[in-house]
Amino acid sequence: MDLGISGRTAAIAAGSAGLGLGAAKALAADGVRVAICGRDAAKLAAAALAIGGDVVTLEADLSAPNSGREFVENATAALGHLDILVTNAGGPPPGTFENTDLDAYQAAFDMNCRSMIEMCRASIPAMRERGWGRVCAITSVGVKQPIGYLMASSVARAGLTSFLKITAREVAADGVTVNSAQPGTHWTDRVAKIVPDKETAASSVPARITGDPDDFGAAVAFLCSEQAKFITGTGLLIDGGQAAGLLD
């Protein structure tokens, strides 16, 4: 299916590995010129080879103040303008109510909420002026069904989801859509650190498999497509049936 985005430009945060890399590969395969960021130069170089084509790589630590804004500004300068923004960042360490302290909540907010808001504020105004834009935030199934052992992550990303919903309504008339892709258990380096055995990780998923980052990337690319112009303010669960709730 032609997604209608060939020739567009995109910035994908934390695009050097995992779900961000899956999104970058999918967008590039559809003819989008991409810029990615990450903290490790070697991983960025390897990701650029995996993505193929003319990839802009930028070093950035999204836990640092203003890093989200700076990434978007640098990506825009390199690409000329920005049509598509995929926000993404590594998740906080596991923790429950009992062992998650206030500093952990602050760190999670800075990484998984504030940096995303910075990126949106730096990119959406120009999208509105041009009359076309796509924002897709990679969040978590935890915003629909909170994960007890990922307390800080679930709290921070739930706050981001409210921001996305409100922003989507505000900018919809200007041709800009704002959505989120909400992954369940995908086999990434982060998941492997929490649950080292792949079969054990899959056992909590009704589909009894773990998600593939490349499949996830294809879903993100669709949300960023021309065909998805009537989809905004929503969260797409990509979770193998993990979330059991009825309501969005």
Name each model-derived stretch.
Residues 145, 221, 232-248:
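Short C-terminal tail/terminal secondary-structure segment
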Residues 125, 169-170, 229:
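Alpha-helical segment proximal to the catalytic Tyr-Lys
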Residues 120, 156, 164:
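Active-site helix of classical SDR
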Residues 96-97, 104-109, 191, 201:
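Substrate-binding pocket helix/loop in short-chain dehydrogenase/reductase
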Residues 14-18:
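Conserved glycine-rich cofactor-binding loop
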